[in-house]
Regions:
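Alpha-helix capping and helix-loop boundary segments enriched in small/acidic/polar residues
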Residues: 12-15, 100-103, 167
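Helical element adjacent to the flavin cofactor pocket in flavoenzyme catalytic cores
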Residues: 56-67, 89-151, 155
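Glycine-rich active-site loop/strand segments that organize a redox cofactor
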Residues: 1-19
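Residue-level signal for pocket-adjacent positions within structured domains
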Residues: 4, 43, 77, 81, ...
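Flavin-dependent oxidoreductases
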Residues: 131-191
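Alpha-helical segment that forms one wall of the substrate-binding/catalytic cleft
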Residues: 19-27
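Long, contiguous hydrophobic alpha-helical segments, chiefly transmembrane helices and signal peptides
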Residues: 1, 21, 46, 103, ...
Length: 191
């Protein structure tokens, strides 16, 4: 993914984007703590390698993060170390990032929405925006009328369609993958 960002943003732009992503993780943790959001926030994430070639790629990624992005925190776990953590010898190894993290995304969103409401923000659900005007007196045009506000946040996923064509040209596709289960417990996780 970073190759794509370097092509589109240049070397310095890609570094800035990486740094922003690192800062965003700290912001998430701060918001979870400040607002008491119950979203199973946990620090640490491991990219695992199924094939030896995948592990070689993770090794290169670790080096690139350290050299190009001044991010020396990732640890390459060989098969034995990863197996000890996961209880499975299925993987060749993995790249563990202790500063990254994971959470339950829906619960995080619901917690942010509640924090916004607690701060006096009005959230209009199931009210599609047809058009908006930004600036000093933002205005949103909806089917049933207009919404005036002091600040406007476009929170419509990555694809806003005709609502914000200027933003559509600036969106870069990024894949995210989430699986959420109830907590398994130690015995069940090891089985």
């Amino acid at each position: 993914e970073m190759d794509t960002f370097r092509q589109q943003l240049g070397e310095q732009g890609a570094r800035q984007l990486w740094q922003m992503s690192v800062e965003a993780i700290d912001m998430i943790e701060q918001r979870v703590t400040q607002h008491g959001i119950a979203c199973d926030w946990t620090r640490g994430f491991c990219n695992v390698a199924v094939k030896p070639a995948h592990l070689a790629g993770l090794r290169e990624w670790q080096q690139e993060l350290a050299d190009r992005y001044q991010y020396p925190y990732c640890q390459l776990w060989e098969r034995e170390q990863l197996a000890a953590v996961l209880g499975s010898a299925r993987y060749q190894g993995g790249l563990y990032d202790p500063l990254s993290g994971h959470l339950h995304p829906l619960n995080y969103l619901l917690g942010l929405a509640q924090a916004a409401r607690d701060a006096g923000v009005a959230i209009y659900e199931n009210t599609p925006a047809l058009a908006f005007r930004s600036g000093e007196a933002p205005l949103v045009q909806c089917e049933g009328g207009k919404v005036r506000c002091r600040q406007l946040v476009l929170a419509g996923n990555a694809y806003l369609g005709k609502l914000a064509p200027a933003l559509n040209r600036r969106i870069m596709p990024v894949g995210t993958y989430v699986i959420a289960t109830e907590p398994l417990g130690e015995a069940r996780a090891r089985s």
